[in-house]
Amino acid sequence: MVQRMWAEASGPIGGAEPLFPGSRRSRSVWDAVRLEVGVPDSCPVVLHSFTQLDPDLPRLESSTQEIGEELINGVIYSISLRKVQLYPGATKGQRWLGCENESALNLYETCKVRTVKAGTLEKLVEHLVPAFQGSDLSYVTVFLCTYRAFTTTQQVLDLLFKRYGCILPYSSEDGGPQDQLKNAISSILGTWLDQYSEDFCQPPDFPCLKQLVAYVQLNMPGSDLERRAHLLLAQLEDLEPSEVEPEALSPAPVLSLKPASQLEPAPALLLTPSRAVASTPVREPAPVPVLASSPVVAPASELEPALEPPLDPEPTLAPAPELDPTVSQSLHLEPAPVPAPALEPSWPLPETTENGLCAKPHLLLFPPDLVAEQFTLMDAELFKKVVPYHCLGSIWSQRAKKGKEHLAPTIRATVAQFNNVANCVITTCLGDQSMKASDRARVVEHWIEVARECRVLKNFSSLYAILSALQSNAIHRLKKTWEEVSRGSFRVFQKLSEIFSDENNYSLSRELLIKEGTSKFATLEMNPRRTQRRQKETGVIQGTVPYLGTFLTDLVMLDTAMKDYLYGRLINFEKRRKEFEVIAQIKLLQSACNNYSIVPEEHFGAWFRAMGRLSEAESYNLSCELEPPSESASNTLRSKKSTAIVKRWERRQAPSTELSTSSSAHSKSCDQLRCSPYLSSGDITDALSVHSAGSSTSDVEEINMSFVPESPDGQEKKFWESASQSSPETSGISSASSSTSSSSASTTPVSTTRTHKRSVSGVCSYSSSLPLYNQQVGDCCIIRVSLDVDNGNMYKSILVTSQDKAPTVIRKAMDKHNLDEDEPEDYELLQIISEDHKLKIPENANVFYAMNSAANYDFILKKRAFTKGAKVKHGASSTLPRMKQKGLRIARGIF
């Protein structure tokens, strides 16, 4: 290997530059042998070498090494050395035989590279042109993708046109400085119009777009950019007012979907009775799942009530029409042309009762592969419409604030679809009260098979929704039903559930997403030969629909863990680069979704849209009607578990530190089944407490809670969201970015592996620089703080440093929970050690050192029961028992 370092003429910013005067030229004739030759009139040749046993061992050092920072004209540059290969290297045989020559060696040039780390808004905008001219196109891409987090479209245009507003429309010298400047600005504005045209959708006057048109007319008359700008303006002006979303409601308008009833149906597939579920031989019943340490944990989950009318466009099955290439995806889509009449299906249409529930399990008449394909079609269409920068933590975390109810509608649509799939699973399992346990078990088996088909199609969103619904309290507690489920189906259910295990920050689901994100087919362990043979026979290349919640939590974590500004007023652009790494993964997976080739099936779509909705209270009540609570004791749930399955699940368990003697044993057993339906909260680790009354609120309004584990006696359940720092995951809802945890003790051993760690070592390039949840890294950590209420209890993540005292942390938590009218002195901070023990943080203590670092970093912000000057009796212990006196009980409310 040859490595050369030399002084050259200075290059443009962002490109290669000389290291320093008198730099040495070195030749590495082997990986561990370096020959340095000094410049004339300097030191002689110096040879450094040692013996390396295997010449094929990879080089350990990175190709890029940071050496410092520079502050130039209000911009902080990160300085690094980067090795650039000049010629291909020698082959393995050449090196072993020693017949390599100068041309066969690896030639590297070490260059000095400057990248923008932070700067003022004016400097960041001004740097767009030099970065483009210096071949640092990544800067332009990152800026256009993330600038909405720290400025507006109007401000960027004003600063750009102010700085570069004197371009001569006709350059006297072809290729001269003026011509290069004009080409750079034209390329930047053209990229902006093509990729983010929704930024200019500001009805009714479209001021930003008209400003751009005026600038282009003056400086680039007759150019292609002028034509495209005029075309976009004409298209936006032709849209109806209702089709254009005001910028005040959302950072960028998105595709407006018409209700399904207004869209023409697509041709239906004629399914013969042979594809319906046929009678199968009697199989040995499977054991009822006792998931004390359930691997299906939704890492970025956040429970949301049903969609409000303005945000309730049902996902349609009509294929998305093609858009003009000059029009952004934010424009309104018209329905597709009327297709030919659909063929009549070979099964009866679903019958419904007065309450909207299915009277018969017509699900069994739809083959599992058909159901999975239709879910994948719906999920893929919605995921492709997601506006990636809406996932930014600074935008997504604002959705619950007043006036932001319509923020990020494309993400809300994916949330609604996830809820609808989970609701469909629960409704088909519980809706028909006349079904016997054996019939209901066939429905459960059918859904497990649908989940398997979703895995084959790499649809991690619906796969996760189905598994979450099957592990909801309402279905999990049905002992008799699970006893009738075949052992083979139950093993498949377990295997699929392991995909979303929260071990090592959901590393398995993240690795699968990296491995299969852009691959042609899924790599399966369950019947791989049969599946791969079927995939090859069809010859269809598949896309990937991820669990979007993983990306949302990663981006919210980044937004919380990294500062927006450095040194007071300099925008932290390094933070935007890391955010773009996640957004780029979303865009890549969106492109992969174009590989799906699935025909919409009209009758399944009509059946799915007509499915009634069950609230969490309704689903639990129906479950109790099928099997009264007294018959669902947790001790009987494991009665028919085989030894192998018991051992398999016990490996995920650890001895419990305390056992509950509560009479509601069945609810606590179900509480071990940690199900969390979807999506990251606005503040990294928001969680929601649910009670049997069925009322709830959340930081996101969309998630239906009908498939949430529910306690019949009103015992509080807390569902934790994932706080993963980054994910390669994508897809709409990353495979498993949310986690749930029960606040009540369990009658069976509780898993000690649920440490809620949020490390993604080896998965993301920026994970090592972020603090981990449930771990103190350096002088900071992230805690989750909730209000001391029973209903609608939302967890907010707080970044705590070693310098933060209790009043500071309390104020941060109050700001997150919108308690602006109260004073920090009115609240106290308690760490949840266990169900019955809480650690009170002293008034002026340093939270970082006062907290119990061995327990979960979960805190409660509790209003003081006494005035600050009143005398309060404290026990000798630092822990506080749960207060049950009526006089000390704090009023409960929905926040």
UniProtKB/Swiss-Prot annotation:
Annotated ranges, domain Ras-GEF: 367-629
Pfam families to which the protein is assigned, alphabetical: RA (PF00788), RasGEF (PF00617), RasGEF_N (PF00618)
Keyword Acyltransferase on entry: no
Subcellular location: Cytoplasm; Nucleus
Disordered as annotated region, ranges: 301-324, 650-669, 708-754
Ras-associating domain boundaries: 779-866
InterPro entries registered for this protein in UniProt: RA_dom (IPR000159), RalGDS_RA (IPR015758), Ras-like_GEF (IPR008937), Ras-like_Gua-exchang_fac_N (IPR000651), Ras_G-nucl-exch_fac_CS (IPR019804), Ras_GEF_dom_sf (IPR023578), RASGEF_cat_dom (IPR001895), RASGEF_cat_dom_sf (IPR036964)
Listed GO CC annotations: brush border; cytosol; nucleus; plasma membrane
Tissue: Expressed in all tissues examined.
Domain N-terminal Ras-GEF: from-to ranges: 112-237
Highest taxon of the lineage: Eukaryota
Entry's free-text remark on domains: The Ras-associating domain interacts with Ras.
Record-given protein name: Ral guanine nucleotide dissociation stimulator
Organism from which the protein derives: Rattus norvegicus (Rat)
